[in-house]
Swiss-Prot record:
ATP binds at residues 24-31. This is Cytosolic Fe-S cluster assembly factor CFD1. It comes from the Eukaryota. The gene is CFD1. Its cofactor is [4Fe-4S] cluster.
Length: 291
């Protein structure tokens, strides 16, 4: 099932930490979480890359207001799309390669695998503190492919799991936790998204789903609970109207404060060291088992 390669791609040589963002089911706001993690880390002065491997539903270009941008080929490989003049945040997505936003992607597993391999091996990421990989929901061909490509990569920091409070979403998260254990990816923590609704008029937060399921699941599986994120209509409007300027205005929002706290928990020195130790243990276990 897994690749027998023992070295990571040279294109990842300048990447310090690789983080997967996973969800058990669609519609839980995983790409929104990935976007805000990237914006928050970039605001903290980190160099961040976002790789969108949701091949049949790439949404990262739209979240960043970069749908009209294109990647181009250099002598070293594909150059990602940079969101700012300081080049602190860059993006790669199949959405940049489609001729039209409405184009559908109807690919079988082998072609998906080839595309992900090309993203990992042929993109000129340069020096990055974090590469965030936005994945499709569930455990599909894309997940298996990325696991194969990163199986022996030393920069794997771990996975952030996104869920919503509903029971059906929490049940699917258990599958993601099992997937991470099987492939040896440490869990950085669980985020409960859509935990309440923020009124755009009075800013009061009301629960429209149940609450606390993500935190309870984290306790059950002995994972870190990174926090709750409400539904904020102001952020939705901001994404719709940003036109490529999201990075400049996001820092003044209430969501930015929430994600600053989440990043402090997920990417604290203590949590990162613990994740790296877990990754080493899992790789040793895999080698012992002959995987």
């Amino acid at each position: 099932m897994y690749s027998t390669a023992t070295q990571s791609s040279p294109s990842l040589a300048g990447v310090k930490n690789i983080v997967l963002v996973l969800s058990g089911k669609g519609g839980v706001g995983k790409s929104s979480v990935t976007t805000q993690l990237a914006l928050t880390l970039a605001a903290q002065g980190k160099k961040v890359g976002v790789l969108d491997i949701d091949l049949t539903g790439p949404s990262i270009p739209r979240f960043f207001g970069m749908e009209d941008k294109q990647v181009y080929q250099s002598s070293a490989g594909w150059v990602p799309v940079y969101t700012d003049a300081s080049r602190n945040l860059c993006l790669m997505s199949l959405g940049f390669l489609l001729s039209s936003r409405g184009d559908s992607v109807v690919w079988r597993g082998p072609r998906k695998t080839a595309m992900i391999r090309q993203f990992i091996r042929d993109v000129v990421w340069g020096e990055l503190d974090y590469l965030l990989i936005d994945t499709p929901p569930g455990t599909s061909d894309e997940h298996i492919s990325i696991a194969e490509e990163l199986r022996f990569c030393d920069q794997i920091l771990g996975a952030v799991i996104v869920t919503t409070p509903q029971g059906v979403a929490l049940a699917d998260v258990r599958k993601e936790l099992s997937f991470c254990k099987k492939i040896g990816f440490p869990i950085l923590g669980i985020i409960e998204n859509m935990s309440g609704y923020v009124c755009p008029h009075c800013s009061e937060c009301q629960n429209i789903f149940s609450k606390g399921g993500g935190e309870n699941l984290a306790k059950q599986y002995e994972c870190k609970f990174l926090g709750t994120v409400p539904i904020d209509p102001k952020f939705v409007l901001m994404v719709e109207n940003a036109k490529g300027g999201l990075q400049e205005i996001y820092g003044e929002t209430d969501m930015a404060k929430i994600f600053a706290g989440i990043c402090d928990k997920a990417f604290s020195e203590e949590n990162e060291e613990e994740a790296k130790e877990t990754a080493e243990e899992e790789k040793s276990r895999a080698a012992t088992n002959g995987q």
